[in-house]
């Protein structure tokens, strides 16, 4: 039994959406990991009594003022938080569309039997 063209099209859309959703979730996870690393770095810097810290740049460590590095890290944290929020919104929209397509496909497959 061959599936109607509209059902085949919905299956393709469903599979593409599934791949996109996985990619969004993966990217969000990557940004969340970076965010946690940045927050941990700031936390560790605050524990340090020194006014200077070492920052990795191009494979070497450079001595820098702690306040400057903290400011840079804080800006990076802010950027990462925005990206994570953006990915969460995209994931939510895609998840909703995914569920709708899944329900439509189940109905279409149920009618075809």
UniProtKB/Swiss-Prot annotation:
<dbReference type="GO" id="GO:0051082">
    <property type="term" value="F:unfolded protein binding"/>
</dbReference>
<comment type="similarity">
    <text>Belongs to the prefoldin subunit beta family.</text>
</comment>
<dbReference type="InterPro" id="IPR009053">
    <property type="entry name" value="Prefoldin"/>
</dbReference>
<protein>
    <recommendedName>
        <fullName>Prefoldin subunit beta</fullName>
    </recommendedName>
</protein>
<keyword id="KW-0963">Cytoplasm</keyword>
<dbReference type="InterPro" id="IPR002777">
    <property type="entry name" value="PFD_beta-like"/>
</dbReference>
<comment type="subunit">
    <text>Heterohexamer of two alpha and four beta subunits.</text>
</comment>
<dbReference type="Pfam" id="PF01920">
    <property type="entry name" value="Prefoldin_2"/>
</dbReference>
<dbReference type="GO" id="GO:0016272">
    <property type="term" value="C:prefoldin complex"/>
</dbReference>
<keyword id="KW-0143">Chaperone</keyword>
<comment type="function">
    <text>Molecular chaperone capable of stabilizing a range of proteins. Seems to fulfill an ATP-independent, HSP70-like function in archaeal de novo protein folding.</text>
</comment>
<dbReference type="InterPro" id="IPR012713">
    <property type="entry name" value="PfdB"/>
</dbReference>
<dbReference type="GO" id="GO:0005737">
    <property type="term" value="C:cytoplasm"/>
</dbReference>
<dbReference type="GO" id="GO:0006457">
    <property type="term" value="P:protein folding"/>
</dbReference>
